Amino acid sequence: MAAYSWWRQPSWMVDNKRSRMTPNLPWLLSALTLLHLTMHANGLKRGVQDLKCTTNNMRVWDCTWPAPLGVSPGTVKDICIKDRFHSCHPLETTNVKIPALSPGDHEVTINYLNGFQSKFTLNEKDVSLIPETPEILDLSADFFTSSLLLKWNDRGSALPHPSNATWEIKVLQNPRTEPVALVLLNTMLSGKDTVQHWNWTSDLPLQCATHSVSIRWHIDSPHFSGYKEWSDWSPLKNISWIRNTETNVFPQDKVVLAGSNMTICCMSPTKVLSGQIGNTLRPLIHLYGQTVAIHILNIPVSENSGTNIIFITDDDVYGTVVFAGYPPDVPQKLSCETHDLKEIICSWNPGRITGLVGPRNTEYTLFESISGKSAVFHRIEGLTNETYRLGVQMHPGQEIHNFTLTGRNPLGQAQSAVVINVTERVAPHDPTSLKVKDINSTVVTFSWYLPGNFTKINLLCQIEICKANSKKEVRNATIRGAEDSTYHVAVDKLNPYTAYTFRVRCSSKTFWKWSRWSDEKRHLTTEATPSKGPDTWREWSSDGKNLIVYWKPLPINEANGKILSYNVSCSLNEETQSVLEIFDPQHRAEIQLSKNDYIISVVARNSAGSSPPSKIASMEIPNDDITVEQAVGLGNRIFLTWRHDPNMTCDYVIKWCNSSRSEPCLLDWRKVPSNSTETVIESDQFQPGVRYNFYLYGCTNQGYQLLRSIIGYVEELAPIVAPNFTVEDTSADSILVKWDDIPVEELRGFLRGYLFYFQKGERDTPKTRSLEPHHSDIKLKNITDISQKTLRIADLQGKTSYHLVLRAYTHGGLGPEKSMFVVTKENSVGLIIAILIPVAVAVIVGVVTSILCYRKREWIKETFYPDIPNPENCKALQFQKSVCEGSNALKTLEMNPCTPNNVEVLESRSIVPKIEDTEIISPVAERPGERSEVDPENHVVVSYCPPIIEEEITNPAADEVGGASQVVYIDVQSMYQPQAKAEEEQDVDPVVVAGYKPQMRLPISPAVEDTAAEDEEGKTAGYRPQANVNTWNLVSPDSPRSTDSNNEVVSFGSPCSINSRQFLIPPKDEDSPKSNGGGWSFTNFFQNKPND
């Protein structure tokens, strides 16, 4: 927008003041003028910005603006719109209503009385479309369904063009201020006033609270480009329930959708303590005062009696019943048909069970739109999901019918439709009143009654014919329809004297469905003459004088009636010799005839007449080239084959009988055509395990001739008895057994062989109670030659018990076993050999032993009986009498205290074998300090009691030896010397080699040593003492004198003293050489000594 203004002053005002102007007056006037213009311009600018135009019908714009600064609102003169007819409109205030302007910019000028002007540029885009506040015409409530129905006028006539309207509806529940429902609803304004409706169902029963509704709307017109805004909310419209009953719980007997949520309230004068659905407690919701509610989520399908809801107060109990279920399902498989073209029956499946019964059950209405006829079906019995049926009477002459089936219950409705041509949907009723009338023995008339008006269609009927032991036969018949009529059909090709069962069903010729089968009608046709003669056979008696004639009863389809008797005649050269009448049920005749060739005739007779004769020759052509064959069948049948014989012109006859029966053997026979070469004999009389004889006869002009003779079984079984066998002969190494044949009746099959088991065993031992072939110690013999009746078992042991078992077998299996225990005879030659061999071996061993003992007698004597030396001849105990006897100073048995010294025994490296050192353990404890200085591997510290010697020896070397308290053994020589080689004997000291080496050598002078050597050299053959006798002390080493002696040279003791430390007998040494001449060995037993 653009605006401008100006200010003019009257000239008289200028003239009056001109005389009073001072020099500063022009400047002051200019400043005031500029200030006035600035303030006016700001006021005009604000007025342009605050101009607002609205419209509520797009026909008239309502514009308002604030007056400029310094201008009174009442000084508006007019408003002018440029380029518009009647462009100026007088005004008195700052508000004007002008007709809607065309799209585009328009210049608007506002003139004031004081001369001011305001100019604006106005466009439709700057105008706001704000509809008038809507008015609610009516608000009603359905308290049973808790529904509100709202009505209002949309005022569509006020708008110049059709427009879309959006309505916003707000529902409040007192005392709550928040809306419980806020819904948008779209409608079309058509240019005329229309009353709009809106329905809303409350979760809370309307009885429980006051409900208020308010609406507003919004217009969306494509012909208006300005702003579109919501109208103001309409005034609230309230609705409340006026309590006129004593009911306290709402809703009452409500029908709800299963799985939905619902709220139930209780308006009680006293405090409500609890609320529950069924037996389940629910939390209470306080609404206002004493009014409470409970909320139920996902309510299940109710039982037939509904679901109980109870509120308990201090002094009473209140409640209601809720019925939860489903709306009707769409009717399924809707089909319509007619049974009699008078009434149409429609059937359907109701689908899902609604769960509602009684007055809330689904009601079905079948409406035919062409005729306008309808029928109602209301099932109240139960909840079964069965097929429903509903009938509608047909309109005469109407064939096309359009049916609509509607199902309704309190929760909703569903529909299904079908269009049919009724003449193509005919399923007649069941035929009734069946009748059968004979025309002759093979043709009858069958009739039935069928209700219905079928004059315009043809009927297709099926007649089912059934006779005993035969397949059912169905015949079709097309019949011209009639109204409630009896229909007749001729049934031919029947058998005489046969019981039949008839029944019928019908449909239309175009076929929709068959009717159900009628009841059965039984009928027996009349008799006729037999169509064939009896099947005949003959056998000569065992004495050959009488001919026995056999015949089989005629089957029903050939007898054509009840056979009363049979006429049997024989003729010779076409002259009848005799005639016999045999009454039924006898089927054999015996005639005495000669050996001539007679022709036997048999004729069957019933009430209608006689059959053609059956003829058979009495003579049989002999055949000597006959061999007996074997055959095995399967189940209750046996298969026989033969070669074609061109000489056979009539037929073949197979006769069979039980082989155990006496002659004449006849069980049954069968005739087959002459061109056949095989047949299967089957009979219910065949039994498994029974042998039958089969005879094949061929027929020629001269008579019958036996062609083959066969024995066989229809099924082989195992024998029922074991072969009876005995022992014929027994030897030391063999047994001969013999057995008998098994009777045919007990064999029950063709004998294939015998199984013979045997093993060692005694009677009544667990091992031999039964023999199994898989045991390794059991021997088996399979005898396949059935003519063999003996068996010799060889390679047996003498005088041994054997267990023998014999079993027969066929293809049907093994028969039972027959067992026997047999002991073989004793073998005399073996017994003699068993005695002689041990005797001979004993004699040989005795002779060899005697020879060896004689040759080794000296060695045996030395080994087992050595010479025991006489102790009196031992010089080891012969001592010098001067030493051991006659001295009072020698106290041999005197016990004196002994102070032990430690003796270290060191191992010396000797070139000769040594005696193993012996460790002597002292009773005195060892000193740890002294032991640590000596290597434990090279020496042993022992306790030693040195004897005290009073004799003094002046050898200075002895001071070192005798004065030490520790005595060290360097070596202990054995009393036996090692064997020296020949070349080494010259270098050995004769004294050392000749005799015993003492344990210790006492120091002596050279002169004494030489003298001693000479003396010892001559005494090498005798015993050498262990010590020098000259050094022996005559007193006990433990005597006080010996203890106090200062003599440092001492002896180890005397052999006569109990305190001696000398080794009289050397210990065993593993390293010492062993003697090779003595001792026991097996090789020495066979060697001779040099002196032997």
Swiss-Prot record:
GO MF, one annotated term: oncostatin-M receptor activity
Pfam (any one): fn3
Domain Fibronectin type-III residues, every copy: 45-126, 330-429, 430-529, 533-624, 622-714, 719-828
SMART domains: FN3
Single GO BP term: positive regulation of cell population proliferation
PROSITE patterns documented for this protein: FN3, HEMATOPO_REC_L_F2
Sequence segments annotated as region (Disordered): 1009-1092
Entry's Gene Ontology cellular component terms: extracellular region; plasma membrane; receptor complex
Cytoplasmic side: 854-1092
Motif (Box 1 motif): 864-872
Extracellular topological domain residue ranges: 44-828
Residues carrying a glycan: 164, 199, 238, 261, 385, 402, 421, 440, 453, 476, 567, 647, 658, 675, 724, 782
Organism domain of life: Eukaryota
Modified residues (Phosphoserine): 922, 1039
Motif (WSXWS motif): 514-518
Disulfide bonds: 53-63, 80-88, 208-265, 336-346, 461-506
Keywords, alphabetical: Cell membrane, Disulfide bond, Glycoprotein, Membrane, Phosphoprotein, Receptor, Repeat, Secreted, Signal, Transmembrane, Transmembrane helix
Transmembrane segments: 829-853
Signal peptide span: 1-43
Written domain comment of the UniProt record: The WSXWS motif appears to be necessary for proper protein folding and thereby efficient intracellular transport and cell-surface receptor binding. The box 1 motif is required for JAK interaction and/or activation.
Protein's job: Signal-transducing molecule. May have a common pathway with IL6ST. The soluble form inhibits the biological activity of LIF by blocking its binding to receptors on target cells.
Binding partners and assembly: Heterodimer composed of LIFR and IL6ST. The heterodimer formed by LIFR and IL6ST interacts with the complex formed by CNTF and CNTFR.
UniProt family annotation: Belongs to the type I cytokine receptor family. Type 2 subfamily.
Name of the protein: Leukemia inhibitory factor receptor
